[in-house]
């Protein structure tokens, strides 16, 4: 295998000794560039060793601990065999999220590490760069609460309340104000509970910092740190700013979980970057501060979150659009009524009462309350499934999601290393290779990393190796060396033989053996070919070798390992496809690893390096071609945070509703940008704050279950909105004609009760039995309005027939044994309440049984409306039972007609095309040619970029 092929074996330095070559890894490239840039400051590198430091490294203290009982350690690990480790395997890229940060000139970073900055220089830089803190935008809670009283529907409700107060109709005033307050309170509470991303980010920041100033090591408040400061890092230190390590020959382990969500510590050396809010686990070093405040990685993440959150939610747009159209219709109806009244010289008080009645019924005052309640009940149900909804509108967004951009580790995979079938050279048994690899592992529980845990857990499959392991005595143990990329242990066999065991990056282990003696050509070739094969398939691999006594080094073989897919992921992905959901994997891992994972899951293998998106200067595709490229890709590997943001943005510009999963601060911008941001199990507080939904259960199946539930909730909301718009149109048409033609109207109090009954009964739709759609759902507003208008017209015709046939001068159907107000109130109430049974069904109204809550609420309201009519409450007279029965029978007939119309409209593709302004019959030949040409263009683009 050539050196070029060897370098294609891509591994990550922060994942210990799994690496054959660091040259290809983007994280390493970032570190390398940092090193090269820091080398311009020769004084920093030459004098770093002269800086006064505290002695005693944490690792030295660790070595003083006695070895734990190996049997007990293995048993404890194997008792949890098959469970996911806490240590993440995905390397999350933290190169930056925003190209607009303020870059500190290199001359300001050339500080002498032995002396630090002078007090005068600190003052100058603080004036230039400001304090080391993130900018705050304090928004008054009162103003935020008052904003929930702003909107088309709210304006109409407020106008109606003022008009009712002018007419001294205090009952109406109270009802309207109560609905306004309910809507505002529910919305405000939900937004307040979601919290502030900036507040969560601030919780991760340090309070103090130890720096060198004027040659003295002093402790200062963290917000006084300035760029160019020499800052001390030691075990337990929380980095107060971004910086670059200037101490040579240092070795730090940094906990970046507050940023990346990954619990496995990252290794840092001379020239590497350290990010604000990272915690030093072991080691000591000094760093030069490169960015402070809003210019740090955390600060830029918060800024990008702010940019993403400035867009109005899709659900809010829909409700506002509906409200505006209804407001226009109300104004048109009022103009008709006013014109008729002026020609008849109707009194001003009567005109105002007519105006109040049209205003109340013209705009669904309870629409926000019912929809909010429906989503709140759905959110409570999702919480029982360990999905915490932080923003109610996210339920509607999730129901319409067409593409899910998912991370790999923990969501698609188990988040634990698993060993696969080992490759052994001729004459070596798998048990022998496993024994040697486990001998070269730490015996301390605290010192175990993900690799050692995977080996010790897997001993259950190698009983001979497990039995032999306890018989060896460890004489020396040398943990992972970042230079030689190996772990070394010197042990004594039961026979007293001294054996040196190593495991590490395969090519480095091979080099160790080759330096001792020539390896047979066939063994050498087979070994390298196996390493190359594993690399191409995305496996990480460990080479294993040993040296017995004074003999030669022996190459034993290679142990491949991988973070395996979750057991339910492949099945869940198939289910997602059946639900019309496309899944794209975005991972920080190498392309080979990403492709192998996708192959095992059946996700597709069109996986590309994220550099092709062009953010790092590697892309040259024009806008439309880039959009096609992203749309047809199955995923991207080696992604930085800005790549995730860009992918979401491109897909949204193509008209897709996109969901994004994430767990770290670096994911916060893309979580906020996505239509539905999903914080997965174990996410940082900042990621949770930026997300719309937080999942406490691991895996993709939890997300798919929530998606199905959200579609059920959407079905309830959609059916209610169709129902409620139809009711408003019904009464606008009917009352408008009644006033304009007959100069009469229903009593204003009964109009208010009709509005209240309509919303009180349907509040329980939140608990209704609802199906979930087999594909992403959308509002399809033209179709929604078409159905609502037709249903409203049918209702208006039914009411007009009731008015003009039951009350004739010489005796109608009711033959004057009933009060007009009471009979019309009952007929309107019954037909409107029953309409919900029509719109809630996916097919004929009898095909789906409503929940007992909805059926009970509607029946209860019907009984109350009947009592109103029988006893003449708010009517001029009582109505006999025979007339009431006739009204019920007539209303049932109207209900059946409504059901027939709705079924035809909901199943007719021609109606859908007509409402959306398309021809009734699609020209298939033209459409087929267009689809074929578009597909060929996309395939050509994909082939060109993959070659």
From Swiss-Prot:
Residues 26-61 have a biased composition (Low complexity). Residues 7-22 have a biased composition (Basic and acidic residues). It comes from the Eukaryota. Residues 166-169, 343-353, 768-783, 875-886 are extracellular. One of its GO terms (biological process) is proton transmembrane transport. Keywords: ATP-binding, Cell membrane, Hydrogen ion transport, Ion transport, Magnesium, Membrane, Metal-binding, Nucleotide-binding, Translocase, Transmembrane, Transmembrane helix, Transport. One of its GO terms (cellular component) is cell periphery. Pfam families: Cation_ATPase_N, E1-E2_ATPase, Hydrolase. Residues 1-144, 190-320, 377-748, 804-853, 904-947 are cytoplasmic. The plasma membrane ATPase of plants and fungi is a hydrogen ion pump. The proton gradient it generates drives the active transport of nutrients by H(+)-symport. The resulting external acidification and/or internal alkinization may mediate growth responses. This is Plasma membrane ATPase 2. It comes from Saccharomyces cerevisiae (strain ATCC 204508 / S288c).
């Amino acid at each position: 295998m050539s050196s070029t092929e060897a370098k294609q074996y891509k591994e990550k330095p922060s994942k210990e000794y799994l690496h054959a070559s660091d040259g290809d890894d983007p994280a390493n490239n970032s570190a390398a560039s940092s090193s090269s840039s820091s080398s311009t400051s020769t004084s920093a590198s030459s004098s770093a060793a002269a800086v006064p430091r505290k002695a005693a490294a944490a690792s030295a203290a660790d070595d003083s601990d006695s070895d734990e009982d190996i049997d007990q350690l293995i048993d404890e690990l194997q008792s949890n065999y098959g469970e996911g480790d806490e240590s993440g395997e995905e390397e999350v890229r933290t190169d930056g999220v925003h190209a607009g940060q303020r870059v500190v000139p290199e001359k300001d970073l050339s500080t002498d590490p032995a002396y630090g900055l002078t007090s005068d220089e600190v003052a100058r830089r603080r004036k230039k760069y400001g304090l080391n803190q993130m900018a705050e935008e304090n928004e008054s809670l009162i103003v935020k609460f008052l904003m929930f009283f702003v909107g088309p529907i709210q304006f109409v409700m407020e106008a109606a309340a003022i008009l009712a107060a002018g007419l001294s109709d205090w009952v109406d005033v109270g009802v309207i104000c109560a609905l306004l307050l309910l809507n505002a309170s529910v919305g405000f509470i939900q937004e307040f509970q979601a919290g502030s991303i900036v507040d969560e980010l601030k919780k991760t920041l340090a309070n103090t910092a130890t720096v060198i100033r004027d040659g003295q090591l002093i402790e200062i408040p963290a917000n006084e740190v300035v760029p160019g400061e020499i800052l001390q890092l030691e075990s337990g230190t929380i980095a107060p700013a971004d910086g670059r390590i200037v101490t040579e020959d240092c070795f730090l382990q940094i906990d970046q979980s507050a940023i990346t969500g990954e619990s496995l510590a990252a290794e840092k050396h001379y020239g590497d970057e350290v990010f604000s809010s990272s915690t030093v686990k072991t080691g000591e070093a000094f760093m030069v501060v490169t960015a402070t405040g809003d210019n740090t990685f955390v600060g830029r993440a918060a800024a990008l979150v702010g940019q993403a959150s400035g867009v109005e939610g899709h659900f809010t747009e829909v409700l506002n659009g509906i409200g505006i159209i209804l407001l226009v219709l109300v104004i048109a109806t009022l103009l008709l009524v006013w014109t008729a009244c002026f020609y008849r010289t109707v009194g001003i008080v009567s005109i105002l009462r007519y105006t109040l009645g049209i205003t109340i019924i013209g705009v669904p005052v309870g629409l926000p309350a019912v929809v909010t309640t429906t989503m709140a009940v759905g959110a409570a149900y999702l919480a029982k499934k360990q999905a915490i909804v932080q923003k109610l509108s996210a339920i509607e967004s999730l129901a319409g999601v067409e593409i899910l951009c998912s991370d790999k580790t923990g969501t698609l995979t188990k988040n634990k290393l698993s060993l696969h079938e080992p490759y052994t050279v001729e004459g070596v048994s798998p048990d022998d290779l496993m024994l040697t690899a486990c001998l070269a592992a730490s015996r301390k529980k605290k010192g175990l990393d993900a690799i050692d845990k995977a080996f010790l857990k897997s001993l259950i499959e190698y009983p001979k190796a497990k039995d032999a392991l306890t018989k060896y005595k460890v004489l020396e143990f040398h943990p992972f060396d970042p230079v030689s990329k190996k772990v070394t242990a010197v042990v004594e066999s039961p026979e007293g033989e001294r054996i040196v065991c190593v495991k590490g990056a395969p090519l480095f282990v091979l080099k160790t053996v080759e330096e001792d003696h020539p390896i047979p050509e066939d063994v050498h070739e087979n070994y390298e070919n196996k390493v190359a094969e594993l690399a191409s398939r995305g496996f990480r691999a460990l080479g294993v070798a040993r040296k017995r006594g004074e003999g030669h080094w022996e190459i034993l073989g290679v142990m491949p390992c991988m973070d395996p897919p979750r057991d339910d992921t492949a099945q869940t992905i198939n289910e997602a496809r059946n639900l019309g959901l496309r899944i794209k994997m975005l991972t920080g891992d190498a392309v080979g690893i990403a492709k192998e994972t996708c192959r095992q899951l059946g996700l597709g293998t069109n996986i590309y390096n994220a550099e092709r998106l062009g953010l790092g200067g590697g892309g040259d595709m024009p806008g439309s071609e880039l959009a096609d490229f992203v749309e047809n890709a199955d995923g991207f590997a080696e992604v930085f945070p800005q790549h995730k943001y860009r992918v979401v943005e491109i897909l949204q510009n193509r008209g897709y509703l996109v969901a994004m999963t994430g767990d770290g601060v670096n994911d916060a911008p893309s979580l906020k940008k996505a239509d539905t941001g999903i914080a997965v199990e174990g996410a940082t507080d900042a990621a949770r704050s930026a997300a719309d939904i937080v999942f406490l259960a691991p895996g993709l199946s939890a997300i798919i279950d929530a998606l199905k539930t959200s579609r059920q909730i959407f079905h309830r909301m959609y059916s209610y909105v169709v129902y409620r718009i139809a009711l408003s149109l019904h009464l606008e048409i009917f009352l408008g004609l009644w006033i304009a033609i007959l100069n009469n109207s229903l009593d204003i109090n009964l109009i208010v009760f009709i509005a209240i009954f309509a919303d009180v009964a349907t509040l329980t739709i939140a608990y209704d039995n609802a199906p979930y759609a087999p594909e992403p759902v959308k509002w399809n507003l033209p179709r929604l309005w078409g159905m609502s208008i037709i249903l409203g017209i049918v209702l208006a015709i039914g009411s007009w027939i009731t008015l003009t046939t039951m009350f004739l001068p010489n005796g109608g159907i009711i033959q004057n044994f009933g009060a007009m107000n009471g009979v019309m109130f009952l007929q309107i109430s019954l037909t409107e309440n029953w309409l919900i049974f029509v719109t809630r069904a996916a097919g004929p109204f009898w095909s789906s049984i409503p929940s007992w809550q909805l059926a009970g609420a509607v029946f209860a309201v019907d009984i109350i409306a009947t009592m109103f009519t029988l006893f003449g409450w708010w009517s001029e007279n009582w109505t006999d039972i025979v007339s009431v029965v006739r009204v019920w029978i007539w209303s049932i007939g109207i209900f059946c007609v409504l059901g027939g119309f709705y079924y035809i409209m909901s199943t007719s593709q021609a109606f859908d095309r007509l409402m959306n302004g398309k021809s009734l019959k699609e020209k298939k030949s033209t459409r087929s040619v267009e689809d074929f040409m578009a597909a060929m263009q996309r395939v050509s683009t994909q082939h060109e970029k993959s070659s």
